[in-house]
Amino acid sequence: MSDDTEDDSGGESTADMEFGEQPAPLGVKVGSTRTVVAEDDADSPSVTQTLTCLATYDDALTGEEHVIYGAEAATEYPDRVRFMLRSGLPEDEETTGLAKRFFEEFASANGLDTDSVVVYAIPTIDNEAGLDRLAEIIEDGPVGERRIASYPESLCGAVPALGDGLDAIEDTFVAINMGSTNLEACAYRRGEQLAPFSTGAITGTEVDRRIANYVEEETQGRVNIDLTTAREYKEQHADFNDYEPFSDIIQQPGGGTYEFTIEDAVMDAVDEFVDAAVDEVANVFLPDLASDYVKIYQQALDNPIVLTGGMGCIPGIVSEFETRLGEEIDREVEATTADEPETAAARGAHRIAERLVDLGEY
């Protein structure tokens, strides 16, 4: 909406006359597990995140339907909370509507600026219908009156990993997005995607399922945990550098409690994830990249491989991936990730949004 037409009295653009001052830059990632928004100064952004879920309940006095979202919904209404983007994208009209309602509630509760330029970090998934539904959610959203743009999640996540500015937009490198619902790999050449690859077989959610199964096996069937608890075990205890067994207590059906200790379940699951991710990258993605863009393949592997997504938060996973991939392809490689990988995509999107505002591209 960049319009430089001036009037006779003030010299203000049509956009400024309509909206006022410069729009606020926002970076947004609406993920399958978490939604993250970065705003304010890109050098030190304010980051807000919540679980991508909602629940409804009827007011006990008026019968009016109310909506709650995020951790509050997951904790208070575990029986009917809806994670509407479990597969990474909305699957039908119902989940699209739920996602719209969730984002409206989230934006309102957190005071997100409607007079804004918004950059969304979106997944690289071969699902045109799902991407169209995601676009509908974005376009109908409560923010981004000046401009809405979208960039690949792995590119956005690489931005804070490769410098303080937007160096990632000028570099040639490989990014691996280790998300809840997909493992994505892509080469970037000055922001252009090359040989994008995605699989739903190697995911953070699959790690959660394995942890739940392995906990049951390790406790000889005495403990059954849900996927939310398995995810919490992973996030709180998985550590390639300094893992320590941990204990938990459950309430038994007949009364009383049972205390148990987990030795291997969590690390077995994340160890298998790294092996599977390395195998897919080394034996599927990289050969395809080399076949189509051999010079880009060579140049990209001379630069650090950027790991993004929630699984990148596990301490030591970057060096573990680096070592195993190097052994698999018989070549020295370097891997890196941003600080706080779980929010990196939103923070990178925010930097892009701020640059668009600075350039007047709205």
From Swiss-Prot:
Biological role: Actin homolog which might be involved in partitioning DNA between daughter cells when chromosomal copy number is low.
Assembly information from the UniProt record: Forms dynamically unstable filaments. Monomers are added at the growing filament end. In vitro, salactin polymerizes in the presence of ATP and AMP-PNP but not in the presence of ADP, GTP, ATPgammaS or buffer alone.
SUPFAM superfamilies: Actin-like ATPase domain
Assigned keywords, A-Z: Cytoplasm
Gene Ontology terms: cellular component: cytoplasm
Source organism phylogeny: Archaea, Methanobacteriati, Methanobacteriota, Stenosarchaea group, Halobacteria
Knockout or disruption consequences: In standard phosphate media, deletion of the gene does not affect the rod shape of the cell, growth rates or motility. In low-phosphate media, when the chromosomal copy number becomes limiting, cells lacking this gene show defects in cell shape, perturbed DNA distributions, reduced growth rate and reduced viability.
Protein name stated in the entry: Salactin
Subcellular location: Cytoplasm
Record flagged with keyword Cytoplasm: yes
Listed Pfam families: Salactin (PF25229)
